[in-house]
Curated annotation (Swiss-Prot):
Highest taxon of the lineage: Bacteria
InterPro entries registered for this protein in UniProt: Aldolase_TIM, TIM_sf, TrioseP_Isoase_bac/euk, Triosephosphate_isomerase, Triosephosphate_isomerase_AS
Enzyme class: isomerase
Protein name: Triosephosphate isomerase
Length: 243
């Protein structure tokens, strides 16, 4: 049985003081969280130790927003798996569309990051998705399949999460129709050939659409951006009820 993963990606938001205030509001909202789901937050690196301390003994798990493929070395601005594990981080987001866009990350680099995470006991959340232009040209499936096949090469599908995030739906307020998101997630599952693969949807997820998304047969969780910054809104998302 696939256990859904509800994850919030804070991106470059939240100081340590803001993270403390956030978790003070959020933790009471998940006091009765059902046991049939994982709950994860990916804060900026500076707030990881703060959240690790304040979330100890709760249902909240931690993710990094990236991870390097080397254990140490002259890699300015990067972070290693061992540095993350020291703070009880369990997941690592790799391949998000923003580093793909702004830092020209390739599928090969993303695969190196994901392999490093998995080898060192972290669960990679590998992001894939097409741009608006690629979708309008009918290239969405080809682009996503390439990202999946190259990004997941050599990985154990039972120890990773794939996040389908159509780029045109990230931070735009546009949400992919639940049925279409479900169709793409089903294709990803068939390409990987693993019925137990956890596949999230990401892209303008909010309290108003979470129940419908989680009612889809091939969507096993969500990767939430802006809506995860509001503790009450993210609490509602965490406590979804399938529609």
């Amino acid at each position: 049985m696939r256990k859904p993963v509800i994850a919030g990606n804070w991106k470059m938001h939240m100081t340590c003081a803001q993270a403390r205030a956030w978790i003070g509001t959020f933790l009471p909202l998940i006091a009765e969280l059902p046991n049939d789901r994982h709950l994860v937050v990916a804060p900026p690196f500076t707030a990881i130790s703060t959240l690790a301390e304040l979330s100890e003994g709760t249902r909240l798990e931690l993710s990094s927003q990236n991870v390097h493929w080397e254990g140490e070395g002259a890699y300015t601005a990067e972070i290693s798996p061992s540095m993350l594990k020291e703070h009880n981080v369990q997941y690592a987001i790799v391949g998000h569309s923003e580093p793909r866009k702004y830092f020209s990350e390739s599928d090969e680099q993303i695969n190196h990051r994901a392999r490093s995470a998995q080898t060192n006991g972290l669960i990679p959340i590998v992001c894939v998705g097409e741009s608006d232009e690629q979708r309008s040209r009918g290239e969405a499936e080809r682009v996503i399949r390439r990202q999946v096949e190259q990004g997941l090469e050599g990985l154990d599908p039972s120890q990773l999460v794939v996040a389908y995030e159509p780029i045109w739906a990230i931070g735009t307020g546009k949400t992919c129709e639940a049925s279409e998101a479900n169709r793409i997630c089903g294709l990803i599952r068939s390409w990987v050939g693993s019925p137990d693969l956890i596949i999230q949807y990401g892209g303008s997820v909010k309290p108003g659409n979470i129940d419908q998304l989680m009612g889809m047969s091939d969507i096993d969780g969500v990767l939430v951006g802006g809506a995860s910054l509001d503790p009450e809104g993210f609490g509602r998302i965490a406590n979804y009820v399938k529609s």
